Regions:
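Active-site catalytic microenvironments in core metabolic enzymes, especially phosphate/sugar-handling
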Residues: 2-345
């Protein structure tokens, strides 16, 4: 169908490329539909298209996307080696204003090399936190199961801690943070074990408990709140915890103290460990499904400017693409145990 449309346009003017590759544009359009930029916390966030690399058809990249939490030098190398068109980096690599772009700074070096290789960068960041079915819901699902799933291990109701005041259609439950109210009290030990299993952290996870308490001493959990990344501003309200158990990536020392002084438990997963699994578990498939229709639409739209360029016709006739999760993206922290007797004096 696309090839037929392109042939019909073959007598028109020569192709006038968009500023970035048509495939990159389709990916960005898809991400905006899945995770509306409007929902991001603009009080501090810098989400959106952060690096738009010009499209050169003769040196075009593959129609492929690489998903990552952090755009490190290792991930940039991975994308260049793979020949991806665009990186979806959850955390914005450009967060504050840049006064220069030099090779002396590792992040700027990555941006320059990506631009040189025709690879764009898009960051959805807190829009992913806010959407229904986003990271906050994903974290809560690990413990409770989805709210409306029959036979859920922990029957519950859930709500948004900070609801979006004017959500776009289809995103009525959007906002920051989620809180579940259990129909029957649960055990903290069960919450911890489920997170360890679902996040594949056999060495354990950090847990802050009220002084004098052990995990097995907290069998009457009624409410569980989640916030990916840094959760203090969402999970604490005027110095008080919003739930019996707070699950987040990290919480400041003083906020954790305030939480446990008020009887809550804090489960800190390390910042990006509360986010990374979402890419493979949820985002990848969502983007694949959205991109199928969007890439068809963009290819048809681009047909109008192709002219008689057979190479461009063949390229735009190909509906195939790939969406992959980075193999080199990882949290900077890990839990290690070292036996004292392995050291020689």
């Amino acid at each position: 169908m696309i090839r037929s449309a392109l042939r019909n346009f073959s007598t028109m003017a020569s192709f006038n490329p968009t500023s970035c590759s048509p495939f990159t544009r389709a990916v960005v359009n898809s991400m905006k539909k899945l995770y509306p930029e409007y929902l991001a916390d603009k009080s501090f966030d810098n989400n959106g298209l952060l690096l738009e690399s010009p499209f050169n058809f003769a040196e075009r990249q593959k129609n492929s996307v690489l998903l990552t939490i952090d755009l490190t030098r290792a991930v940039a190398d991975e994308a260049i080696e793979r020949g991806d068109s665009i990186i979806i980096a959850y955390h914005p690599i450009i967060f504050r204003g840049l006064k220069s772009l030099t090779l002396n700074n590792s992040q700027q070096d990555s941006l320059l090399r990506l631009a040189q290789n025709g690879i764009s960068v898009y960051s959805p960041h807190t829009a992913v936190d806010a959407v229904p079915g986003g990271m906050a819901d994903w974290l809560l699902d690990m413990v409770t199961g989805p709210e409306l799933t029959p036979g859920s291990a922990l029957p519950h109701t859930r709500s948004t801690i900070h609801p979006e005041q004017n959500p776009p259609p289809g995103f009525e439950n959007a906002g920051m943070g989620r809180i579940a109210t259990l129909e029957q009290p649960g055990r903290l030990a069960s919450v911890v074990n489920k997170l360890i299993a679902n996040l594949d952290k056999p060495n354990g996870i950090p847990v802050a408990l009220p002084q004098g308490k052990e995990i097995i001493d907290m069998p009457d959990i009624r409410t569980i709140a989640t916030c990916p990344g840094s959760g203090s501003s969402i999970l604490m309200n005027n110095g008080k915890p919003v739930a019996d158990v707070l699950v987040t990536g990290e919480m400041s020392h003083h906020d954790a103290l305030a939480a446990i002084e008020n009887g809550a438990a804090v489960i800190s997963l390390f910042h990006s460990n509360s986010e990374r699994g979402y890419l493979r578990a949820v985002m990848r498939q969502k983007l694949v499904e959205a991109l199928r229709d969007e890439w068809d639409a963009v290819r048809t739209q681009e047909a109008a400017g192709v002219g008689g360029d057979i190479g461009m016709i063949d390229w735009l006739s190909d509906s195939n693409f790939t969406v992959s999760v980075s193999e080199r993206d990882q949290d900077p922290y890990d839990i290690r145990t070292i036996r004292v007797d392995t050291f020689s004096t």
